[in-house]
């Protein structure tokens, strides 16, 4: 049983690195360091893979809770369909 759990964990880790590109998913949360994030975004040492999206964005991208550096929307901003951080009021 423990071998199955270990193998599953390793496969999940490899999959998350391949999908996430070692720092983001789907074109955001890149490897850029502090000061290199796009407008309305901040660098986070541990939240780069899991993003907050506007309610009308369906389906939501996969969020794997593995600590990864990357750019995330500032407080009060959410990602729209174009993956740009916009004020919550402009989600549409």
Swiss-Prot record:
Q: Is this entry keyworded Signal?
A: yes
Which residues pair up as cystines?
A: 37-71, 46-67, 50-63, 54-91, 73-85
Q: In which tissues is it expressed?
A: Expressed by the venom gland.
GO CC annotation, single: extracellular region
Site positions (Reactive bond) = 65-66
Q: Which residues form the signal peptide?
A: 1-21
Q: Name one Pfam family in it.
A: TIL
The compartments listed are:
Secreted
- Which GO molecular function annotation, any one, does this entry have? serine-type endopeptidase inhibitor activity
Main location group = secreted
Protein keywords: Allergen, Disulfide bond, Protease inhibitor, Secreted, Serine protease inhibitor, Signal
Q: What is this protein called?
A: Allergen Api m 6.03 / Api m 6.04
Species assigned in the record: Apis mellifera (Honeybee)
What's the source species' lineage? Eukaryota, Metazoa, Ecdysozoa, Arthropoda, Hexapoda
């Amino acid at each position: 049983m423990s071998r199955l759990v270990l193998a599953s964990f390793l496969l999940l880790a490899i999959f998350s690195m391949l999908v996430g590109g070692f720092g983001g998913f789907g074109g955001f949360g890149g490897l850029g360091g502090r000061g290199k994030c796009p407008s309305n975004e901040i660098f986070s040492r541990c939240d780069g893979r899991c993003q907050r999206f506007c309610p009308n964005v369906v389906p939501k991208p996969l969020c794997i809770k593995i600590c990864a550096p990357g750019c995330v929307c500032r407080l009060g901003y959410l990602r729209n369909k174009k993956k740009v951080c916009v004020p919550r009021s402009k989600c549409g």
